[in-house]
Swiss-Prot record:
Assembly and interaction partners: Homotrimer.
Organism of this sequence: Klebsiella pneumoniae
Protein name according to UniProt: Outer membrane porin C
Gene Ontology cellular-component annotations: cell outer membrane; pore complex
GO molecular function: porin activity
Pfam family, one: Porin_1
Source taxonomy: Bacteria, Pseudomonadati, Pseudomonadota, Gammaproteobacteria, Enterobacterales
Region forming the signal peptide: 1-21
Family: Belongs to the Gram-negative porin family.
Originating gene: ompC
């Protein structure tokens, strides 16, 4: 019975991102759930910038309220707290998600706040590794991952007419510099800035666990970004396509992304053009073991003074063992295939392997 339960639970955990959110309140159409995890995590690497303790905790709240038969309000907040430094250290906690919205029956939903960019609707399919992965893009990287000030419209099953056909439309306001003409109230460094932008995604669950998706995003770039060593242009564009198979204990996913002035090249700026590729494969055994293998590559084209260079390139081999729905342990080995050269050194890109070992309690 235990192995049967595990075989049903684990895929659900991977999709939901939480093992079994604790229901705090559910009465009169109002519901509030608490979820989170504590990851006792250690990295082993020759790269002294990452080697050592990486323990952290995440905590989130999801709520919804039934306004009438067709209208539901909802909100979500998620927070990350690092636990690998002294109690007096700074910059050890931050908000990952914070948004509120309304769902209008089959007409779709609209929300605003800090949320995932629509490009992640497709690239998330390969972001399933035990520890690493999902790093041909990053947070606060236009609409490629978590981002500030995004207004998102989502529609599931195409107004209730086509099962499995989902689409989204998104707008992001400017997040500029700390001071000067391009300043905004939440100013940040050039690599994290963005001008006004929009994006869209379409995903379709075709049949028998097979899904396909496409996403596009276009954002204005800031003056600060165009003053960086790499990357020049008025706009940052992202085109993404992906395929996924998730059935019969097998998980296979791949995505290809082509960007223009949108993929970070370490600390130097943005690649004028980049080709990003990720593929991941996993198998869920009934007794709780989930081995994983993946390949990720981001290649920058025509990098000023450096030509074509790999920005990221590695093979990932790992495994997770689920004791039950709340407790798991994992090992993840990142086999770095980058060469140590003038570009990686100038950009501050590590070329060392990393092994991650973690013990996780989640709820």
């Amino acid at each position: 019975m235990k192995v049967k339960v595990l075989s049903l639970l684990v895929p659900a955990l991977l999709v939901a991102g939480a093992a079994n959110a604790a229901e705090i309140y559910n009465k009169d159409g109002n519901k509030l759930d608490l979820y989170g995890k504590i990851d006792g995590l250690h990295y082993f690497s020759d790269d002294k910038d990452v080697d050592g303790d990486q323990t952290y905790m995440r905590l989130g709240v999801k709520g919804e309220t039934q306004i009438n038969d067709q209208l539901t309000g909802y909100g979500q907040w998620e927070y990350n707290v690092q636990a690998n430094n002294t109690e007096s250290s700074s910059d050890q906690a931050w908000t990952r998600l914070a948004f509120a919205g309304l769902k209008f029956g089959d007409a779709g939903s609209f929300d605003y706040g800090r949320n995932y960019g629509v490009v992640y609707d497709v690239t998330s399919w390969t972001d399933v590794l035990p520890e690493f992965g999902g790093d041909t893009y990053g947070s606060d990287n236009f609409l490629q991952s978590r981002a500030n000030g995004v207004a998102t419209y989502r529609n599931s099953d195409f107004f209730g007419l086509v099962d499995g056909l989902n689409f989204a439309l998104q707008y992001q306001g400017k997040n500029g510099s700390v001071s000067g003409e391009g300043a905004t109230n939440n100013g940040r460094g050039a690599l994290k800035q963005n001008g006004d932008g929009f994006g869209t995604s379409v995903t379709y669950d075709i049949f028998d666990g097979i899904s396909a998706g496409f996403a596009y995003a276009n954002s204005k770039r800031t003056d600060d970004q165009n003053q960086l060593l790499l990357g020049e242009g008025d706009h940052a564009e992202t085109y993404t396509g992906g395929l996924k198979y998730d059935a019969n204990n097998i998980y296979l996913a791949t995505q290809y992304t082509q960007t223009y002035n949108a993929t970070r090249a370490g600390s130097l700026g943005f690649a004028n053009k980049a080709q990003n590729f990720e593929v991941a494969a996993q198998y869920q055994f009934d007794f709780g073991l989930r081995p994983s293998v993946a390949y990720l590559q981001s290649k920058g084209k025509d990098l000023n003074g450096y030509g074509d260079q790999d920005i990221l390139k590695y093979v990932d081999v790992g495994a997770t063992y689920y004791f039950n729905k709340n407790m798991s342990t994992y090992v993840d080995y990142k086999i770095n295939l980058l060469d140590d050269n003038s570009f990686t050194r100038s950009a501050g890109i590590s070329t060392d392997d990393v092994v991650a070992l973690g013990l996780v309690y989640q709820f």
